Amino acid sequence: MVLNRFPLPAIALALAALGLAACTATPTTTPSATATSVTQTASATPTATPTPSPTIDADQAAALEVAESYEAALAKVRADPAKYDQYKMIDLLKPLAYDDMIQANLNGIRTWRDKGWHEEGSQIILQRDPGQPNSMSNGTTKVSVTICKDQRDLVVVDKNGKKVTAKAAQGPDFLKNTYDMRRSKNSESFKVYEFGGDEVDGCGS
């Protein structure tokens, strides 16, 4: 795993924050928070149809739901960055992530928006696994969620539809994302507190 703490280099931040590359984006503040197919076009919202999975408890299910919603939200942004300015992105991500993660995404998408890039193609979620809930000393509940996906069909194109070869637009074929999901003592919802990614050869069963 490639580990980084803020501030990240611009390219690494762009990839990590957008959920496309093997990096970790770690916030600097303390919070006060199976196979699934995901299909995406330049303007379509990815959809997911979960298949049967082992029994999980309410906290695991809630954390997994938010992690998947976060992935879907970022897919919307990557498919049409011009549609999501800073304020629309904040509105989209505020229910799903802590402020430092939102800022990382704002920084990460800026290059795409400025250059007229967007993402086309489809990705397939091959594994989704919520870990056991942990109760922290401050009353926060923590769940680690792993999502492994096949990104081989994804392509970043410019405003003319030409494939972008710049490093800031490249991601691995298979990516295993690990989300540190946290729900603070007085909150009803989990949010993404920390994000990490591993480039893998494939997603095992």
Where in the sequence are the language-model features?
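Bacterial N-terminal signal peptides that target proteins for export
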Residues: 1-12
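Bacterial signal peptide processing site
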Residues: 24-27
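Post-signal peptide N-terminal segment of mature Sec-exported envelope proteins
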Residues: 32-58
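Core segments of small alpha/beta cavity-forming domains
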Residues: 48-121
